A protein has these predicted regions:
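Conserved G1/Walker A P-loop phosphate-binding module
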Residues: 1-83, 200-206
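Canonical P-loop GTPase G-domain recognition
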Residues: 3-15, 146-205
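Short, well-ordered secondary-structure micro-motifs
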Residues: 19, 63, 84-85, 120-123, ...
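Hydrophobic aliphatic residues
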Residues: 43-47, 100, 191
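Conserved nucleotide-binding/hydrolysis micro-motifs of P-loop NTPases
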Residues: 58, 71, 78-81, 116-118, ...
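Amphipathic alpha-helical transducer elements in NTP-driven molecular machines
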Residues: 59, 89-93, 121-124, 181-184
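Conserved nucleotide-sensing/catalytic segment adjacent to the nucleotide-binding pocket
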Residues: 68-106
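Conserved C-terminal guanine-recognition region of P-loop GTPase G domains, centered on the G4
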Residues: 94-170
Length: 206
C-alpha cells in the first residue's frame, strides 16, 4: 500500500462523538515512550502528523486520522502513567475498554512494545486482556535500530517464550524502526489486505 493522503480528522474523549463507522479502523497503542508517534509518522510518511510530546499521556483522547480517504488510523494515548490522577486513569480505562469492545469497525489494534526491554508486566496484562476479549491485535516491536541483530533476536525470543506460557500460538509479530523504516511495508500490507476485506464484506450487506 502507498500512502497518498493522511489528514488529522478529530480528537475525542467520548464514544458518542467518534467518526462514523463506514471505514475500517486500525488503532495504535502502547506504554509511554514506546515510540508510537514516531512510528505513525514513519508509516504515513507525514512528519509531524502524530505529535510527539515531552509530556506524553498528558491528554486523554482518541485521535483519528483519515488515510487515503478510505481507512482510519487511530492514535490512542499511551498507558501506564503513574503521574496521572486516579480519576484520569479510571476515565481513560473506561474509554479504552468501551472503544476496544464496542467499536464495530475496529479491524486490528497494533500493540507497540519497546524491543529494548524485557517483558513488562503492564504490557503483558494488556495483551492478555485483549486476547481474553478476543480483540484482534498485532504485536509491534519498536526501536529495533537501537539493538544489534543478536540482542534483537534474543529479546524477541524471550518475549515469545513468555507468551507461549499461556498461549498455544503467537499473534502476528512485526519488528519495526521509525528510523530505518523496517516493518513499515509489513504493517501497510496487512492494513491494505484487511481494508479490502472490510470493503468486500460490507458491500455484501448493501
Amino acid at each position: 500500500m502507498i500512502i497518498e493522503t493522511a489528514e488529522f480528522l478529530q480528537s475525542n474523549t467520548q464514544m458518542s462523538k467518534l467518526p462514523e463507522t463506514r471505514f475500517p479502523e486500525f488503532a495504535f497503542i502502547g506504554r509511554s515512550n514506546v515510540g508510537k508517534s514516531s512510528l505513525i509518522n514513519a508509516i504515513t510518511g507525514k512528519k509531524g502528523l502524530a505529535k510527539t510530546s515531552g509530556k506524553p499521556g498528558k491528554t486523554i483522547t482518541v485521535n483519528h486520522f483519515l488515510i487515503n480517504g478510505n481507512w482510519y488510523l487511530v492514535d490512542l494515548p499511551g498507558y501506564g502513567f503513574a503521574k496521572r490522577s486516579k480519576t484520569e486513569r479510571e476515565k481513560w480505562d473506561k474509554l479504552l475498554h468501551n472503544y476496544m469492545l464496542k467499536r464495530e469497525n475496529l479491524v486490528y489494534t497494533f500493540i507497540l512494545i519497546d524491543s529494548r526491554l524485557e517483558p513488562q508486566k503492564i504490557d503483558l496484562v494488556f495483551i492478555e486482556w485483549m486476547a481474553e476479549a478476543q480483540i484482534p491485535f498485532v504485536l509491534v516491536f519498536t526501536k529495533t535500530d537501537k539493538l544489534g541483530i543478536n540482542t534483537r533476536a534474543k529479546n524477541l525470543e524471550i518475549y515469545k517464550k513468555q507468551l507461549l506460557q499461556n498461549w498455544e500460538e503467537l499473534p502476528i509479530i512485526i519488528s519495526t524502526s521509525a528510523i530505518s523504516g523496517q516493518g513499515k511495508n509489513e504493517i501497510l500490507d496487512l492494513i491494505g489486505n484487511q481494508t479490502s476485506s472490510f470493503v468486500a464484506f460490507n458491500s455484501t450487506k448493501i
